[in-house]
Amino acid sequence: MVQVPYSRITTLKDITPDVSNSKYVVYWCIAFKRTKYNFALQRAVEWANKLSQPLIILEPLILDYPMSSLRFHKFMMDGMKEVSETIAKTNAYYFPFIETEPKQSDGLLMELSKQASVV
C-alpha cells in the first residue's frame, strides 16, 4: 500500500501511542464516506498495521444535519451499506451508528477513544 503523502498529514497531538494500554485504532468517518481515495482512512490503516492493532471505523449518521431530509438519510444509509460490504472483506471492524433520536451519538467517539491508541 502506498503511504499517505506527508503533506496530507496533520498531527494534532504529538505523542507516542501507548499500545500497552490500548486495544485498537479508531477512524472517525464523518466527511469522506468512501473506502477508496480516502487519505484519512488510509492513514488509519497505516497506524493499525504499524501498531498491530485492529481498526474500528466509526460512521455516525446524526438526525439534525442542516438541510437534512428523508432523501438525504436514504442516500447516506445506502452508502453505509456499500461501505459495510466493502469493509466486511477486510480485517477492519465497521461500526455504523444511526441516530433514532437527536444527540444520541453525543459522547460515542469520546467513549471509544478511551481505549484507542490513535483516533
What is the predicted function of each stretch?
Residues 1-118:
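Trp/Phe/Arg-rich N-terminal binding region typifying the photolyase-homology
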